[in-house]
Amino acid sequence: MNCIIIDDEATGRAIISQLCSNVASLNLLEEFSNAIQAIKYLNQNQVDLILLDIHMPDFTGFDFIETLKNPPKIILTTSDSNFAIQAFEYDCIIDYLVKPIAPERFQKAILKAESPPSVKKPSVESSTEKV
């Protein structure tokens, strides 16, 4: 699975890069310190997964997602758990990791990313029609 990291903090990128290197199925293509560089890259390259920090100086992670026409799967990374509810308003966001990220938790998020999307069953409404 081809992935990129977008995080304005060098330490954050290094830690997530190390976590990626421990997952054989991940191919880390690039790391970006800002969303603008990443947008240019995504316009020319195919990516399956974005590991995206929420707090960045030029864009928030949510602002960045809004710029994407067909976003790939996204795992949000942040030191702030306050955005979790907002995160799941986006279909492309498959997980939300709070820093510091435990290796086991990272692996679990990657497994979710690798899983095929679940098919939502239509709800069946029961009608009690009187004849």
Locate the predicted segments by residue:
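Acidic, metal-coordinating helix/loop segments flanking the phosphotransfer/catalytic sites
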Residues: 17, 31-49
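Conserved SAM-binding loop
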Residues: 5, 31, 76-77
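Extreme N-terminal starter segment of soluble prokaryotic enzymes
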Residues: 1-3
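C-terminal output/effector regions of signal-responsive regulators
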Residues: 125-131
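Acidic di-acidic motifs
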Residues: 7-8, 53
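Two-component/phosphorelay signaling modules centered on CheY-like receiver
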Residues: 10-30
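CheY-like receiver
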Residues: 39-41, 48-121
